[in-house]
Amino acid sequence: MLTKLRIKLRQLYFKDTQFANLMTKRIFNVLLVANPYDAFMLEDDGRIDEKIFNEYMNLSLRYPPRFTQVFTAEETWEQLRNTMFDLVICMPGSDNSDTFDIARDIKKEYPHLPLVVLTPFSHGIKERMEHEDLSIFEYVFCWLGNTDLLVSIIKLIEDKMNLEHD
């Protein structure tokens, strides 16, 4: 038993990694696709950028991402043409918005761009999502009004982006 363990330990490759070489891929620009009501609710208790900045400072993290909010497909494509985004957060409203259609089109055009669903908890959205193809999304999150969830989403996607390297 001990011999087998020694053999397995020899097979492992350990290397020193400098701290500066960890987390080389980061999220700097986030595109938030939401209807005006959901965007307002998200910012109900303060600007997203300010809250994220304060949360990053409290956690001793550097380089908080910038958020760009869009409401329509036209605004989405204009921003995607002019800015390099690292993450797209889609907030499908309870109305018949085309958020999922926009997300599908983004994934076709930018297949490596991570897409996340952030949805308020409601029965109508739950029923709607049951009929949607969610495979294009990295994750689906239920938002209950706490913007701290955005920091967690960003850190989760960054960890996933750096998994192979770190």
Residue locations for each model-derived region?
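Non-catalytic signal-transmission and effector/linker regions of two-component phosphorelay proteins
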Residues: 1-66, 146-166
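Structural beta-sheet core signal
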Residues: 32, 116-117
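Conserved phosphotransfer microenvironments
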Residues: 41-44, 64, 71-77, 85-112, ...
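Glycine-rich, phosphate-binding/catalytic loops in enzymes
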Residues: 48-49, 104-107, 133-134
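General small-molecule cofactor/ligand-binding pocket signal
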Residues: 67-70, 140-141
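Alpha4 helix (beta4-alpha4-beta5 surface) of REC/receiver domains from two-component response regulators
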Residues: 97, 101, 117-152
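P-loop/Walker A phosphate-binding loop and immediately adjacent motor/lid segment at beta-alpha junctions
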Residues: 107-115, 159, 165-166
